[in-house]
Amino acid sequence: MIDFDGYRPNVGIVICNKAGQVLWAKRFGQNSWQFPQGGINEGENIETAMYRELYEEVGLTKKDVRLLWASKYWLKYKLPKRLVRSDGSQPVCIGQKQRWFLLQLLSDENLIDLKTTKSPEFDGWRWVSFWYPVRQVVSFKRDVYRKVMKEFAGVLLNESKKPETVEKPRVERTEKRDFQKRDNQKREFRKSARMWNNSHQKGKAQ
């Protein structure tokens, strides 16, 4: 599916671990690395497309990740002329327009599987530092990567500032015990008052 301007709608995925590193994948049979990405099918919801690509490219499902952020705007890059192809029957694709998603891996990294389809996109992956991809991706994607990572950096910073949810220790209730103590004190006071009153009355009688 290509829009009127010649751009193919696409989703991009940044997967981070709890250490703040991001998943960096090697394209099949090439010495080229990038984030997982893929086209949006006609009539397909953007988020649905993202989860489909997540499974097809790295073997993860929705339950394996937590969605931290989705970019609000389309980001575009043009393909180099050598990569622009046209067979005459289809609109010419001059580049990609992308919506990006930031995911946190919840499951064990051993569940990452690059061979879920007959034609895998990648044949290797590793964790890299957060800003590493901006310097290493192919030049025509670099501006998009810079904008994406700048946006996602703020999200991860806010995530790191959130306090961990810690269950408050249960406090044993002592009110009942305190009430009993005060009731005993009242009874003792009334008993002492009666004894004093009786002795006082006897004194008057004498």
UniProtKB/Swiss-Prot annotation:
One of its GO terms (molecular function) is mRNA 5'-diphosphatase activity. Residues 6-150 form the Nudix hydrolase domain. It is an enzyme of class 3 (hydrolase). GO terms for biological process: mRNA catabolic process. Its EC number is 3.6.1.-. Keywords: Hydrolase. Its cofactor is a divalent metal cation. Gene3D superfamilies: Nucleoside Triphosphate Pyrophosphohydrolase. Residues 162-191 have a biased composition (Basic and acidic residues). Residues 162-206 are annotated as: Disordered. One of its GO terms (cellular component) is cytoplasm. SUPFAM superfamilies: Nudix (SSF55811). PANTHER family: M7GPPPN-MRNA HYDROLASE. Accelerates the degradation of transcripts by removing pyrophosphate from the 5'-end of triphosphorylated RNA, leading to a more labile monophosphorylated state that can stimulate subsequent ribonuclease cleavage. This is RNA pyrophosphohydrolase. It comes from Actinobacillus pleuropneumoniae serotype 7 (strain AP76).
